[in-house]
Amino acid sequence: MPEPTRPLRPLLPLPDGGWQAMSVATPVDFKIRGLALVPPRSTVPVIVVPGIMGTNLRAKSKPRSREEENEEVNPGKPAWRPPNTTPGGLWDALVWDQYDPAYRQRLLDPDTLEVDDSGEPHIRHAQWGPHVHPQLARERWWGELHAGSYIDLLCMLETRLNQTFYRRYAEDMRRIRPHWQEVMDCDPAKWGFPHMAPLTEAELERHALHHYPVYGAGYHWLRSAHEASQRLEQRIDDVIDYWKAHKRKCEQVILVTHSMGGLVARACARRIPDKIAGVIHGAMPA
């Protein structure tokens, strides 16, 4: 009979290719051991590209000229960071209602702003523990994205893509996670794909051979999609290089986009198609 375990916080990658697990000291009569899930070596990063206004913006931290200095906020201070709660949104609506067009143009002057990665990720907790270590969320640029719009998606992808099977205590039997069972039970015809076969357990087994760390990729949505695509291209290169440096097999990423993020991803994919395994668009403009 398998012994009972308790889930530990998500692991932290080490430069030598290993993983670090954090636990706590317990009394000697507490016999339930901590369980850390070690990801596979093959890594396929998933990068979420938000829609227009979904990236936090701040005044440039180090303006190089007078023209790059924002007239309304100090260097490094937020210029666009929507609140993440309903009361906060109502309050912000009242505040912004007092701003006249001239003030808004000065505040949101594209030449004086940059992507702000210091937003609070607001990590959600799954039934069996946190979706991702808060330190990793910061390092993966989750703070660039508006949490109220995208944190649920980020957490869901991080958990569901990397949690495929499990073993229930007192049962020496592998089971499929409920979120994947729902996908298997779904009729593809309901989604407009009548000729597609439902997902199989064999396909899930192949899926589980890879690690899917989830990243954010904000961009300066007041500037052109071309500039945003260049930033995304650099983000893809940085992520792939990171995992290779940590002795992981990593050649391609998957992009998950929303709205204007789809246009950014398409422009990027034209230049580096070999580094993108696939793109999943959500509500992309025509």
Spans of features found by a protein language model:
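N-terminal non-catalytic accessory region
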Residues: 1-256, 260-286
